[in-house]
Amino acid sequence: MGSEVNRPLADFPANIWEDPLTSFSKSDLGTETFKEKHSTLKEAVKEAFMSSKANPIENIKFIDALCRLGVSYHFEKDIVEQLDKSFDCLDFPQMVRQEGCDLYTVGIIFQVFRQFGFKLSADVFEKFKDENGKFKGHLVTDAYGMLSLYEAAQWGTHGEDIIDEALAFSRSHLEEISSRSSPHLAIRIKNALKHPYHKGISRIETRQYISYYEEEESCDPTLLEFAKIDFNLLQILHREELACVTRWHHEMEFKSKVTYTRHRITEAYLWSLGTYFEPQYSQARVITTMALILFTALDDMYDAYGTMEELELFTDAMDEWLPVVPDEIPIPDSMKFIYNVTVEFYDKLDEELEKEGRSGCGFHLKKSLQKTANGYMQEAKWLKKDYIATFDEYKENAILSSGYYALIAMTFVRMTDVAKLDAFEWLSSHPKIRVASEIISRFTDDISSYEFEHKREHVATGIDCYMQQFGVSKERAVEVMGNIVSDAWKDLNQELMRPHVFPFPLLMRVLNLSRVIDVFYRYQDAYTNPKLLKEHIVSLLIETIPI
């Protein structure tokens, strides 16, 4: 049947990791010697952190180093307690007005507090303006200060004009500043301009910062060695998780049964790794990666395989949540396979959630997938009718078709201690942080994949809808959508500030998923074009850091 049907197949780039099981070989770094050294260094780093409390500003800088080197998770409770105490008891706005508190320092203080949900006033940057309300010209001679200002400005929320000005000011000068900086600082500036720390994938940022920190005069050898060993030990765990997912994929015979989808095991794992890298989330990464593989197959099935009649039958079955697709339903075997594997996967998770005492969570998990499928179905209907939706119609459906509701819900599954039924109910209520993440996901993807999707029959994107409704150029539509994404980041930043409605670890999943989108889709669709992610995958999963 399938060979007689005219299908909207996409010419997806081939998978570049033929066998992750052999590509990502095990290392011998998981020895007791390294683990013992790691434990000893951890105590030394903790002692240094505790000693830094005597100087509040140096303490903040130490926290910044811990975060950027990827080891702050070891001391998270101590860090939050210290920041909480400092924020409540110390007058940081007054402290930063002191003459010795330079732009570099103020930028770090601002970043660290906001990173942990403390909304330090943006007025701390007023001291760097002249009598005309402009940032002082001499600041451009301070490379570290300008970079710190740029990174701090990524944490802006709505109504903070000085942060908008700081971002424009720092960004406009950093390219030139990098040309006259030392080689390692120039690389750091260029990396930041491409992907700011706040919008980067944590593991990628850590790997880059370790190389940078090693060249700094202020480098703490103990902290550096601890960060290197910690990275390498975690890398072993991450490789084992990828191997687990790969075995599952092979055992399901996924590649032979669904030939038209993007087979992106390694890239899907990187997506999960960007969502949470810490060891306690090992099972969560495995489950989320499996889900991403299923989501990819669903997306490609709706977008680049199924006919309208087949997709309607598939969607109806999912809405009813049939345990399997009956033989009499006339859809291709590959679509039946996707359906049956997906429903079985979700039903198994539902059973596990029930056993854990989290009754009802599975209902919301399934509902998130059903809504995503209906979002895909709506796009298929628009394509069939050759209908260009209004921008508002598109935006409403795009929140569903982004798939980020289903993905965020999936990241909650293995967060047993904090993701109870109320968390899933809250997520289903369209909280602002979820909507912001969905907008970032859908519109960033639209902008980056516009050219590829217009090479074949494809539903009108947000860019097309905006151009049609308002009679503007593609360039203007892209600019508007970019502004919408920027506003969504401000919404997301605001929702991360205290007081929190739900535990901060849950909010961090939403933030980290948005960060993955920025890395995967800001410039091109790197998930579809895996060569664009190869360098990151090699640095995170293949190459160990020399000790």
UniProtKB/Swiss-Prot annotation:
It is found in: Cytoplasm. Mg(2+) 3 binds at D445, D446, S449, E453. Mg(2+) 1 binds at D299, D303. Binds 3 Mg(2+) or Mn(2+) ions per subunit. Monomer. Involved in sesquiterpene (C15) biosynthesis. The major products are beta-caryophyllene and alpha-humulene. Does not convert geranyl diphosphate (GPP) to any monoterpenes. The Asp-Asp-Xaa-Xaa-Asp/Glu (DDXXD/E) motif is important for the catalytic activity, presumably through binding to Mg(2+). PANTHER family: ALPHA-HUMULENE_(-)-(E)-BETA-CARYOPHYLLENE SYNTHASE, OS04G0344100 PROTEIN-RELATED. This is Alpha-humulene/(-)-(E)-beta-caryophyllene synthase.
